[in-house]
Amino acid sequence: MAAATMALSSPSFAGQAVKLSPSASEISGNGRITMRKAVAKSAPSSSPWYGPDRVKYLGPFSGESPSYLTGEFPGDYGWDTAGLSADPETFAKNRELEVIHCRWAMLGALGCVFPELLARNGVKFGEAVWFKAGSQIFSEGGLDYLGNPSLVHAQSILAIWACQVVLMGAVEGYRIAGGPLGEVVDPLYPGGSFDPLGLAEDPEAFAELKVKEIKNGRLAMFSMFGFFVQAIVTGKGPLENLADHLADPVNNNAWAFATNFVPGK
């Protein structure tokens, strides 16, 4: 069946190509057709984050970008010294991995800091430091969510693992498969139920939000790496390390610990 496309006059699809017929990959073995709306959205030409005149990694001193980095995608600053994006398939895979890891890192960074912040402001936790909290499951009473014994008790590490696999797997499966009706265009930005506030309805605002997401996500991944190193070196949470540094910046900083750090002590 030949694919047919048309331009719709609806304000939300004006000037955009919509695929009407299914491809062979969208027809399952039993002959059932999964209709998937495919809309090609281009980044706004006036945006400083997209296109050949976008912001580069070294500003005016960046030099010429590789030919395959055209500024089509958010977070493209024209820098790829290792050539990781030269192959289109590898680039598509790495782009998806980066976005997903960015989102997990942003959630993880918040989860590392927020309980410690609450604990420092009087909220009672069994253990608020992120890398110590999990060990509470082996205590006599198990692990209470939010430190409240009236909430669900987590007393089995296998049960927690199973719940996480089921819940996370269900969400990821829903995202990748495009929902029960296959209505999602892009598994990275599924919209629909994943956008209850309608933040992606305006194309220009959505394009800018993609850039903000990838920039904050990259920062969050570096933050998580820093939290891991802090946990190994100091044995303290991020806010406690920050408080120590502010109280005595000369003796509590990365250089001081790097020059005095002895593994295992």
Swiss-Prot record:
Note on cofactor: Binds at least 14 chlorophylls (8 Chl-a and 6 Chl-b) and carotenoids such as lutein and neoxanthin.
Transmembrane parts of this sequence: 99-119, 151-171, 219-239
A single BP term in Gene Ontology: photosynthesis, light harvesting in photosystem I
Binding site for chlorophyll b 5: 164, 261
Transit peptide: 1-35
UniProt name for this protein: Chlorophyll a-b binding protein 1B, chloroplastic
UniProt modified residues of type N2-acetylarginine: 36
Positions with a binding annotation for chlorophyll a 6: 245, 254
Keywords: Acetylation, Chlorophyll, Chloroplast, Chromophore, Magnesium, Membrane, Metal-binding, Phosphoprotein, Photosynthesis, Photosystem I, Photosystem II, Plastid, Thylakoid, Transit peptide, Transmembrane, Transmembrane helix
Signal peptide range in chain numbering: none
Amino acids binding chlorophyll a 5: 212, 230
Binding site for chlorophyll a 1: 79, 85, 98, 218
Keyword match Transmembrane helix: yes
Gene: CAB1B
Subunit: The LHC complex consists of chlorophyll a-b binding proteins.
Binding site for chlorophyll b 4: 164, 175
Localization in the cell: Plastid, Chloroplast thylakoid membrane
Residue numbers binding chlorophyll a 3: 136, 146, 213
Statement: the UniProt record of this protein carries the keyword Phosphoprotein: yes
A GO term, aspect molecular function: chlorophyll binding
Protein residues bound to chlorophyll b 3: 156, 172
Cystine bridges: none
